């Protein structure tokens, strides 16, 4: 009987040590634990081939603004209202005009056009032009848009094909 209680007491002591460690690990997200290299953080800034290297802090700030302003419809780089048009690199590159660089994405967030570039969709897609309809866009400035564009372009390098890949990856 004594050995049973002794054994239980030892197990309980082990749990007391393990629980704080597990709780601490629960609050460390992969984004906070990883330091990305310059190649991962470097993306095209314009169609001419110029590049910009974002910092970890800028990408995390862009992620926060993106999740707050765009994440409801574009979580994971998908487009909930149109599964055929996501935020993956191939889809962005094939748009007209191509939206695979920071300047083009910022321009799109200011005044979005259809995928073929033929007409404005600012009346149905959140943008700076339609900020009165979409409150999440009201307080954004050019720097916020630049940071979101950086996050969108860096995400596929970090998340691979799951960024913009749709529900098969969730």
UniProtKB/Swiss-Prot annotation:
Signal sequence region: 1-33
Membrane topology listed for this record: Peripheral membrane protein
Subcellular location: Cellular thylakoid membrane
Keyword entries, A-Z: Electron transport, Heme, Iron, Membrane, Metal-binding, Photosynthesis, Photosystem II, Signal, Thylakoid, Transport
Major subcellular site: membrane
One GO cellular component, as annotated: plasma membrane-derived thylakoid membrane
One annotated GO molecular function: electron transfer activity
Function recorded in the entry: One of the extrinsic, lumenal subunits of photosystem II (PSII). PSII is a light-driven water plastoquinone oxidoreductase, using light energy to abstract electrons from H(2)O, generating a proton gradient subsequently used for ATP formation. The extrinsic proteins stabilize the structure of photosystem II oxygen-evolving complex (OEC), the ion environment of oxygen evolution and protect the OEC against heat-induced inactivation. Low-potential cytochrome c that plays a role in the OEC of PSII.
Family: Belongs to the cytochrome c family. PsbV subfamily.
Protein name: Photosystem II extrinsic protein V
Organism listed in the record: Synechococcus sp. (strain CC9902)
Protein encoded by which gene: psbV
């Amino acid at each position: 009987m004594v050995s049973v209680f002794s054994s239980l007491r030892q197990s309980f002591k082990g749990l007391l040590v393990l629980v704080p460690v597990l709780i601490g690990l629960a609050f460390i997200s992969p984004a906070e634990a990883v330091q990305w290299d310059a190649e991962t953080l470097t993306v095209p800034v314009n169609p001419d081939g110029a590049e910009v290297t974002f910092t970890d802090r800028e990408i995390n700030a862009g992620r926060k603004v993106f999740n707050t302003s765009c994440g409801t419809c574009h979580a994971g780089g998908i487009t909930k209202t149109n599964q055929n048009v996501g935020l993956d690199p191939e889809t962005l590159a094939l748009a007209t005009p191509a939206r695979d660089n920071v300047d083009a994405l910022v321009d799109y967030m200011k005044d979005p056009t259809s995928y073929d570039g033929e007409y404005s969709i600012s009346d149905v897609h959140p943008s700076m032009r339609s900020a009165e309809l979409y409150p999440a866009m009201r307080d954004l400035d050019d720097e916020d848009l630049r940071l979101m564009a950086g996050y969108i372009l860096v995400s596929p390098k970090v998340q691979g094909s799951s960024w913009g890949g749709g529900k098969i990856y969730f």
